[in-house]
Amino acid sequence: MALSAYAAASESTEDENVIRETFDRLDQNIRNEDCRDTFPQEYKAGAVSHGRYMICLNSVACARGYLDGDKADELIRFCMDRIFGVLGHGDDGIIHEMRTLQGEYIDSEEGHRINPGHIFESMWFVLEQAERVGRPEYAERALHTISVTYQRSHDEKFGGILHMLSDNGTDEQYKDWNAARHLKWDEKVWWTQAEALCALLTSADRTGDSAAWEEFKTLFLWCREHFFDPDYGEWYAVLNRDGSPRMKLKGGIQKAAFHIPRALYQCSCILKKYVAETGDCDAQT
């Protein structure tokens, strides 16, 4: 993803071979069920995890211009098939974070975990690619999944999107895999909100659904009030459930210039197009 963006911005061809070699290794590893996850604590023999297919889908889509297009699209379809055929099946709109390869439950904290941020992120990736790669039915499922995930994860009492859920509702037993972060299930985390904004606005743009538009506005205004620092800029990393900053630090483990700039840029592009087409001053504001 990064090498492809650099190549496009610099108009340099020096990294194209590295991009293709990296894709070939990714294509091999993502299909190998015995290939351990980057994070060893996330690896479970006989299990597959949502995150690997979600980010593979987007990385390949970003790098497609430097790859064999047919091979890239086949891998994108493979990832979508795993997401909807193994980690999410049926019409309940739920994508689980971990399942067996046969789509069966794993009776553990990870097995019952629902990660709203991963789901929102995954679904707007799907909406961007599904029709182009010949999986239009997944676009419809993605729209439904975004709606269901928002209804389950939006905190009606305090606002914002909850960090983690279980398939039985909110799970107060959630423990973050990184002890240095020790995030709690009910906290509000920067990247989860950013991906939710992107998914909700992409859904509203695709469908014209006023409910999705209102959900986006509600979440955006909440983020603007609670995450954004009006004095020094940028977003705080983590908020308590009530919307107060858990810490004043802006950076931290994994919080870099990625989720927030990407989501806000993506949203601004959609809104600019919408304003140009409709002249809606509310959206412009």
Task: List PLM regions with ranges.
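Glycan-recognition and catalytic cores of secretory/periplasmic carbohydrate-active enzymes
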Residues: 1-285
